[in-house]
Amino acid sequence: MANKIRVRYAPSPTGLLHIGNARTALFNYLYARHHGGDFVIRIEDTDRKRHVEDGERSQLENLRWLGMDWDESPETHENYRQSERLELYQRYIDQLLAEGKAYKSYVTEEELAAERERQELAGETPRYINEFIGMSETEKEAYIAEREAAGIIPTVRLAVSESGIYKWTDMVKGDIEFEGSNIGGDWVIQKKDGYPTYNFAVVIDDHVMQISHVIRGDDHIANTPKQLMVYEALGWEAPQFGHMTLIINSETGKKLSKRDTNTLQFIEDYRKKGYMSEAVFNFIALLGWNPGGEEEIFSREQLINLFDENRLSKSPAAFDQKKMDWMSNDYLKNADFESVFALCKPFLEEAGRLTDKAEKLVELYKPQLKSADEIVPLTDLFFADFPELTEAEKEVMAAETVPTVLSVFKEKLVSLSDEEFTRDTIFPQIKAVQKETGIKGKNLFMPIRIAVSGEMHGPELPDTIYLLGKEKSVQHIDNMLAKL
């Protein structure tokens, strides 16, 4: 095993980059960068049925968007896709066959299904029963000849030691142990199409690439004993394994499911909605790990420096969309204006709102944004029809002082010339209404805000009125007075 730390992220090109896979990549990235090691990207594409066109490009593109870089990948190195390494796998399959540690299996899918059904009806744990048990060498040869004559293509199975014990000290979960008798019998290492199975190929790849640490989700725990069997059969030292806990939905307490519509689970979705990649990186880094303390906002460089594998959580990581949005808002609020405007610009352009007021509008709503696409609904006031009032807003506007407040404020606005109507002159007009009517606080500000914007909350009221313009503000107040 290599002395230098080498980790890998090995996705299958079967679709978009999910938040769970992004976390696996990110933790491997942080671990490698923290220790000055190598971060390797390898593509596991042996499952041809699930292969998605452009899946590999999508994975790498979204990892780059998150801010990760890598030392080795299919882009820079030959044979970093499993489909390009079939000769390598065959070499080790042939070795195991020659050493009697693996054998060709001619049992058909129909026979396997029938045996599983029998075992289930008998209340037995489903497992593969070696088809050659009880056969003499002559009978075995006749059986193989008969099957080959019938055109049956064999798989290759690894011979499992039923008495074997497979254990490791997990980086996250501590000591874990499996008995060979609980593995399910001899398992397939090469399919009928000549492709290796996942648990075989991954061992060959990790060994040849000198991977020192395998950090992955705990759904892979059941794969680990099978992989340890291959390491043992080939006489190789296994890497260190670390299995991160599940990600659960914070609202349901259950494993995060792609059917959970209250969460954004694919990195592509965050890109399309205009989240800052730094915010998404920060959020994912805290899913199952934390550096201690109360602070939650960290730059990529800080996370690399702080990352400590000993602080990987043993409890499930709760995916909280509200927390993601809170964190995103914090990043957008504190980002420079040019970066935020660049994120908002495509959404404004698509909505036909890239006007001379666009920069002012982004500046106005920047503190409220959780994602850049929100700039469109937030600016509806300036481009769309006046919104219907909510019940809470109607209740505010039902107060008997409202007509007085609106009428007097309207007079103050109308009295301002175009030159006098500036952002700085609006607040004094509101204070003048207070002085003239004796009405103050929420009873003063809230009716004006609702009459002008149709909302109880928003940016500073003078900013909204100034950007809306005197004429339109007066029009909105007139319309509201007519409804009272």
From Swiss-Prot:
Keyword Nucleotide-binding: yes
Keywords of the record: Aminoacyl-tRNA synthetase, ATP-binding, Cytoplasm, Ligase, Nucleotide-binding, Protein biosynthesis
Keyword check for Transmembrane: no
EC number: 6.1.1.17
UniProt catalytic activity: tRNA(Glu) + L-glutamate + ATP = L-glutamyl-tRNA(Glu) + AMP + diphosphate
Listed GO biological process terms: glutamyl-tRNA aminoacylation
Entry's Gene Ontology cellular component terms: cytosol
SUPFAM superfamilies: An anticodon-binding domain of class I aminoacyl-tRNA synthetases, Nucleotidylyl transferase
InterPro entries with a match to the protein in the record: aa-tRNA-synth_I_cd-bd, aa-tRNA-synth_I_codon-bd_sub2, aa-tRNA-synth_I_CS, aa_tRNA-synth_I_cd-bd_sf, Glu-tRNA-ligase_bac/mito, Glu/Gln-tRNA-synth, Glu/Gln-tRNA-synth_Ib_cat-dom, GluQ/Sye
A molecular-function term among this protein's GO annotations: ATP binding
Main location: cytoplasm
UniProt superkingdom: Bacteria
Signal peptide: none
Motif ('KMSKS' region): 255-259
Oligomer and partners: Monomer.
PANTHER family recorded: GLUTAMATE--TRNA LIGASE (PTHR43311), GLUTAMATE--TRNA LIGASE, MITOCHONDRIAL-RELATED (PTHR43311:SF2)
Family from the record: Belongs to the class-I aminoacyl-tRNA synthetase family. Glutamate--tRNA ligase type 1 subfamily.
NCBIfam families recorded: gltX_bact
Protein name per the record: Glutamate--tRNA ligase
Organism: Streptococcus agalactiae serotype Ia (strain ATCC 27591 / A909 / CDC SS700)
